[in-house]
């Protein structure tokens, strides 16, 4: 069935990615200054925030509210070049539709974090509290899969990444992406970034030790609210959801209007779009 095909495709994809992990581990060297600068929260919406769906606008507004004194930079397809240089072949492949927006965004977040550090938060992540110190002060932080032997092999989520500049894992991920796209004009697997991350962090004892230092927080509660967006709003339930996590991964593709093109009434989604949940 579909799930079995997805799992098999993921396993084959991971086998294909191993050569890039091995090459990066052999050639990587860094003597960059790893002094921690001002902590920056990075967000990106390709078309510009003014053209974003309402869900995205509310999520970004929540980050602005709970940035807790950290610098907050919102980028688009034009302003990213003020901060990073993207290889010409990656830009060309993105322009030609080979590298889709999601995978292009994967490269952008990795390049930004490798150079500057800070916290990358997808534009579809809602914050309901300040960024905790264990995130801001971590050498590397990602939400993780509590099912360590998940058949999909997806051990982390990359919609929220916090790191110091020039972190070895993040810099190696950047190199893996660059090598992969230089040699391939196809998507190995939709989740190939996550598969590559897992392979990389399991590839040497040193990298295993670095990954083991990340405080474990499951991505399951982070994704809980998405499943309840279209249910009737309940104040008590909202308190419970907020107590599960300070961050909540949503989807901008969530149906906002009913068949009469009216905002779906009395739901969590309606409250969110009206700005009542921030």
How would you label these PLM feature ranges?
Residues 107-116:
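Small-residue hinge/turn detector
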Residues 116, 121-122:
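Active-site acidic Asp-centered loop
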Residues 1-105, 123-278:
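Glycosyltransferase-associated regions of secretory-pathway enzymes
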